[in-house]
């Protein structure tokens, strides 16, 4: 059985105190930092960018990047700062070719994850499971804290 992990979300972090907040969380020993990327197309909100992710790579704690964006294959090349300790998670519903996108993530040497929206049946993941390191089953429609 796989172990669970603690991955606090940075979506609601106070950007004026982000360094201090991250340092406090690192002291208590979190496993990952969850970074929500939103594009105002796949979901009706905009949050943290690839530039923010690049800045976060200065910390020791790995990143759990949740891409809530249309056509993630267009943004993934901007995440070459990620490494084998990080996870990049795409939404099944965000691309016509999820397995191809997952393969491109793994080709970068990064762990790959797949997320599904609440209305998406879990059975769509059957053929994808061998290609992922993580599955995220949303319990709320993506786009906002919840």
Regions found by a protein language model. Give the residues of each.
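Conserved, mostly hydrophobic/aromatic
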Residues: 18, 25, 33-36, 79, ...
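Short beta-strands and strand-loop turn motifs
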Residues: 3-9, 33-38, 115, 134-141
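Alpha-helix-loop-beta-strand connector modules within alpha/beta enzyme cores
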Residues: 46-67, 104-113
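Conserved anion-binding
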Residues: 74-77, 82-146
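Active-site mouth loops of central-metabolism enzymes
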Residues: 4-17, 44, 62-70, 91, ...
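Generic structural signal for well-ordered alpha-helices
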Residues: 15, 19-23, 50-54, 76, ...
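Short, well-ordered coil/turn segments that N-cap beta-strands
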Residues: 2-6, 29-31, 59-63, 84-86, ...
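Glycine-rich, proline-tolerant flexible connector loops at the mouths of alpha/beta enzymes
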Residues: 33-48, 90, 140-146
């Amino acid at each position: 059985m796989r172990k669970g992990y603690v991955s606090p979300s940075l979506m609601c972090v106070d950007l004026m105190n982000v360094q201090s907040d991250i340092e406090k969380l690192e002291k208590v020993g979190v496993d990952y930092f969850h970074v929500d990327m939103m594009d105002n197309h796949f979901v009706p909100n905009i949050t943290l960018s690839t530039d923010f992710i690049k800045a976060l790579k200065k910390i020791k704690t790995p990143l759990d990047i949740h891409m809530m964006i249309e056509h993630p294959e267009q943004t993934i090349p901007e995440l070459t700062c990620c490494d084998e300790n990080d996870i990049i998670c795409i939404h099944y519903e965000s691309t016509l070719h999820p397995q191809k996108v997952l393969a491109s993530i793994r080709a970068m040497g990064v762990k790959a994850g797949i997320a599904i929206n609440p209305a998406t049946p879990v059975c769509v993941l059957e053929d994808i499971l061998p290609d992922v390191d993580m599955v995220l089953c949303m319990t709320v429609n993506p786009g906002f804290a919840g």
